């Protein structure tokens, strides 16, 4: 299972893994790296209309280097930086040591 669609913070990634995702598409976070080739632009693949071509060009503001985005350190609590460290911390807080264990987390779904 590959989770895609609006994955912009470490919280989104953590929830996708807990729901069983094997991988997570993170176009927006990677596009926010200073060294990203698109310089803040990326091609979002959301379907705008069923009969029209998929996707749209999306602009995001650079927030740090690729290493900072993936590995930290985080300078704020937005969840946009240190994605792997935040996932590891969330797994530890939930009592899981591996991604495979986290993928089997018991979930509670509440209606609103």
Give a label for each model feature:
Residues 1-3, 8-112:
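Alpha/beta catalytic cores of nucleotide-metabolism and tRNA/nucleoside-modifying enzymes
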């Amino acid at each position: 299972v590959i989770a895609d669609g609006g994955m912009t913070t470490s919280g989104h990634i953590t929830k996708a893994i807990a729901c069983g995702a094997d991988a997570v598409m993170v176009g927006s976070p990677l596009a926010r790296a200073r060294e990203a080739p698109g310089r803040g632009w990326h091609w979002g693949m959301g379907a705008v209309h069923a009969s029209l071509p998929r996707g749209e060009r999306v602009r995001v503001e650079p927030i740090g280097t690729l290493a900072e985005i993936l590995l930290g350190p985080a300078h704020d609590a937005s969840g946009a930086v240190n994605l792997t460290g935040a996932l590891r911390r969330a797994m530890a807080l939930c009592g899981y040591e591996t991604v495979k264990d986290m993928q089997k987390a018991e979930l509670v779904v509440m209606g609103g």
